[in-house]
Amino acid sequence: LLNTLTEAVGKPVTEIHTKDLYAGNSPFRQLTPEQRSNLIGQIFQWLRDRKHSVVFTAVDKGNFLANRDNEAFHADLGTLWRHMAFHITLALQKHGQTFEKNKGNTVLIFDNKVNDQRNFTKLLLNPPTWSDTYYAKKKKQEQLDQIVDVPHFVDSKEVALIQLADFLCYFLRKHLELSLGLAAPKFDGEVDVMNGYATNTLKLASPKAHIFLNRGRCPASDYFYRYAPTTIR
């Protein structure tokens, strides 16, 4: 992918900066909107060809900040980042245990997050018991048994898949901002463009019931559901 981008712009591209690619900022300034759209399409196709799947989450930040202090579960998580990272962890656990002999095959790799790394690691080593119901933990089952030990934190410049996660997050976030009226479209048709990119992203996602369960929610799944934007859950 980086080679494809390098060939397109005629100079080395060492990191996928999706905002710059989409908007036509340097180093993509000389490319036409159609050329940039084609490159974005190639990245989505690359993900599809390799059968990558996605687990995502989203939070209505205003709702979350206004109510977090009244949430008993929030005391165990502590920050918005940990709220989202733990939700992803639980969704991966729920998804992973649907496969046979898959125990301990999931490694969590995050972009560097200095302020949260230590506490999040402690959280995963000793998960709160309220989270067990999210994935219907069995009596003799170990907590988060799909997850390998502790999370890893890396510099996204050195890990291309982190950059691709950012790529997908960019379009999903822009879609949510436009659909909720939190941002205005910058050109005619941008809402439709973002709807298309969001659809491509969601087609890669694991079953929605592993992330935002529409009914029959336990308190843990309801906690994450209630703070998700209405247009994504």
Regions found by a protein language model. Give the residues of each.
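Phosphate-ester processing/binding pockets and catalytic centers
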Residues: L1-R233
